[in-house]
Amino acid sequence: MAYWLMKSEPDVYGIGHLQQDGTTLWDGIRNYQARNFMRSMHIGDRAFFYHSNATPPGIVGLMEVVETGLTDPSQFDPANKYFDPKSKPEAPRWDCVRLRYVGTFQALLSLDALREQFSVEELPVVRQGNRLSILPVPEASATRLLELLGPC
């Protein structure tokens, strides 16, 4: 099992939305590196839900990958802000995964706290200016995060 960190703005789609929905398609990713990370995911992988563009930003919950290799439907919808006119149903450019809500941690682990606990090599999200919305989390770092965050 691998671990990931996946960012979303809480007012757009936060951990509360996922808790209510139970599962969600993680769609709208329009960065090739983030897309390729999603393509590397496997069923059963876990992902830390990170609230970005929040005060403060940080890890709030845990998700599990339940489906992989899905075509992102938003790329074909002209009314969707993630519409991609260059993407065609016979040759889609963008993928997504389905995630299941696992739990919400009792307290947010802020970016500032993460920077105090982890180096850039241990947890890439602490790199200044890192805007990538999906990042791998090394197993040793995931273990430490779970210890710091406690049960959810």
Describe the function of each predicted region:
Residues 1-43, 141-142, 149-152:
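Compositionally biased, charged N-terminal/linker segments
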Residues 3-4, 24, 97, 132-135:
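A broad, low-specificity signal marking well-ordered, structured residues that form hydrophobic/aromatic
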Residues 7, 27, 66, 100, ...:
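Residues in well-ordered beta-strands of folded domains
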Residues 16, 58-64:
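Short, ligand-facing micro-motifs at secondary-structure edges
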Residues 50-57:
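Short, charged beta-turn/beta-strand-edge "cap" motif at the junction between a beta-strand
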Residues 62-128, 132:
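Aromatic- and Lys/Arg-enriched surface recognition patch
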